[in-house]
Amino acid sequence: DPEIAEMQVLDQVALSVIQWSGVDAQEVSLDWTQMLSPSHVQLFANAVQRLPRAFVMSNTAPAEAMTKALGHFDHGPNSARQVIDMSGDGTPNAGGEVNRLRRQAERSGVTINGLAIEGLGRASTNFYTRHVITADGFVETAQGHRDYARAIRRKILREISTVFG
């Protein structure tokens, strides 16, 4: 998306991708990459599109994903703002205490935003709203996996507009 790419380059955003699922299922799939030019953005987007799904038919352990993401900032570039973008299509059925990790993120100055992928109802959206996002965060909802592209674009534009406001 040209609008998103331009803003990412202007702010020199650094991105990384962590795939997650169950208690022992978190993987840094793409390490930190700083968006210094439109070609960096395009290369990163292409790499994301080529990523195979790391975990299939596993539990849902968001606390462990949050732990992995918080620790991953130690390996990234220095930045004025740190944001975890967490997406998922279910509520927890394994793992630790999500609220504790949310409080840890807030104490560390990390914002957590969510992208809830719904099937029927709003269980994931409600879970993300009540337990995952930080006080300065928000949840965007995708109505199924086919709606993900629209929802992620809207979510990224909202995050970036917070910076450029």
Language-model segments: residues:
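VWA/integrin I-like adhesion module and closely mimicked acidic/polar interface patches used
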Residues: 90-131
